[in-house]
Amino acid sequence: MLDLAFVRANLELVEARLRARGQNPAELLGDFAAVDQHRRERITEAEQLKATRNKLSEEVARLRKAKEDASAVMEETRQLKTKIEDLERAATEAEEQLRERMARIPNLPYEDVPTGASAEDNVEVKRWGTPREFDFAPKPHWELGEQLGILDFERAAKLSGARFAVYWAEGARLERALAAFMLDLHTREHGYTEVLPPLMVNSRSLFGTGQLPKFAEDLFRCEDGEPYQAGKYRENDHWLIPTAEVPLTNLFRDETLDDSQLSTSLVAHTSCFRSEAGSYGKDVRGIIRQHQFQKVELVKFTRPEDSAAEHEALTRHAETVLERLGLPYRRMLLCTGDMGFSSAKTYDLEVWLPGQQVYREISSCSNFDAFQARRAGIRYRPRGQGKSAHVHTLNGSGLAIGRTWLAILENYQQADGSVRIPEALIPYMGTEVIESRNVAQGAK
């Protein structure tokens, strides 16, 4: 959430940055200035009447002490009390209107974020690794996985419907090996603290990280007998997490951290659940876009002056996973029109997929500035200062396990259909190659 005082003092700048995002400021802000002015005027009037009431109360006391009639002054005091209550109620209603507007306004992009309308305007920052030259036509991961008997879409559809997968044998082991490898790397070398959070969170948590109220349709809500009405939710509703960013960030919700606790770096391996409401017809083959998937998530809480450097560090931590696995990738700086709702600056890491001849996103690393901290009430007390301030929050995938899994299949496939295991994963896999096991080829 943006700072109300900042928006009030910099309304033209806010409108310009929203336009750079491809947003309509008039639609988002509405009559923000008028409502804010109305609220401030009602507060001022109420304060003035309170001062008058206090003087009248003193007059009542004086009259009573002098044993004089104070009824007229007391009646005036009662009338003032009613007027003050009406003014305060009007100010509260205006503040609620402002909060509702502010909750739906996205973060403002940093000045060094390129202006653009879509992914076509993102800027490539770097490339690592040279895509392998094959002496045969490389296959996409869905063909490789089914031929090896380690990926089963037919049975997954029988169990759960579209956009689910069953992993068999070495396929399941490769997912587990990737998670263990990533967690070990981030905790042992990058200084993250591992957390195992709940997979269900309340509405307040999703508001804190920015998924609610605007993106409820992208989430899975857990039914509790109460009929759900689109666009309406309750504070105690439970939702399946779309990413571990949500529980990790909200661990410190409504808390004030000590300066010595920053920067704090957390990592979690969890299942993630997304409805993919707006992706009908996209990536219908393979495991690029699933309702349920595994991810290792990185989250940082930093001082404002450290967040830019910590953003670069977090992105490098995600890149290190790809480099250790020998997977070619590129880093993209997202333009204003392609950024997430809560982000002030985002790098996407895109891995090369030879079976599809394309780079695909495998990690998104974002600096949220104080946007999430303001929504979630996460503050810290700077050393030597009495007044607290909002922390900056950052997060990134370190990495999406399913997409790393498919990238290994496509980049390490052999002419005979087998798949070599990257050297860094051999200790976790206990084998150097995945060959066809026909595990999933039973009766159908």
Curated annotation (Swiss-Prot):
The gene is serS. InterPro entries: aa-tRNA-synt_IIb, aa-tRNA-synth_II, aa-tRNA-synth_II/BPL/LPL, Ser-tRNA-ligase_type_1, Ser-tRNA-synth_1_N, SerRS_1_N_sf, SerRS_core, tRNA-bd_arm. Catalyzes the attachment of serine to tRNA(Ser). Is also able to aminoacylate tRNA(Sec) with serine, to form the misacylated tRNA L-seryl-tRNA(Sec), which will be further converted into selenocysteinyl-tRNA(Sec). It comes from the Bacteria. Transmembrane segments: none annotated. The lineage of its organism: Bacteria, Pseudomonadati, Acidobacteriota, Terriglobia, Terriglobales. Pathway: Aminoacyl-tRNA biosynthesis; selenocysteinyl-tRNA(Sec) biosynthesis; L-seryl-tRNA(Sec) from L-serine and tRNA(Sec): step 1/1. Consists of two distinct domains, a catalytic core and a N-terminal extension that is involved in tRNA binding. It holds the Pfam family tRNA-synt_2b. One of its GO terms (biological process) is selenocysteine biosynthetic process. It is found in: Cytoplasm. ATP binds at R274, S275, E276, E361, I362, S363, S364. L-serine binds at T243, A244, E245, E297, S397. This is Serine--tRNA ligase. It catalyses: tRNA(Ser) + L-serine + ATP = L-seryl-tRNA(Ser) + AMP + diphosphate + H(+); tRNA(Sec) + L-serine + ATP = L-seryl-tRNA(Sec) + AMP + diphosphate + H(+). Homodimer. The tRNA molecule binds across the dimer. Its EC number is 6.1.1.11. GO terms for molecular function: ATP binding; serine-tRNA ligase activity. Gene3D superfamilies: Bira Bifunctional Protein, Domain 2, Serine-tRNA synthetase, tRNA binding domain. The keyword Ligase applies. Belongs to the class-II aminoacyl-tRNA synthetase family. Type-1 seryl-tRNA synthetase subfamily. One of its GO terms (cellular component) is cytoplasm. Keywords: Aminoacyl-tRNA synthetase, ATP-binding, Cytoplasm, Ligase, Nucleotide-binding, Protein biosynthesis. CDD domains: SerRS_core. It is an enzyme of class 6 (ligase).
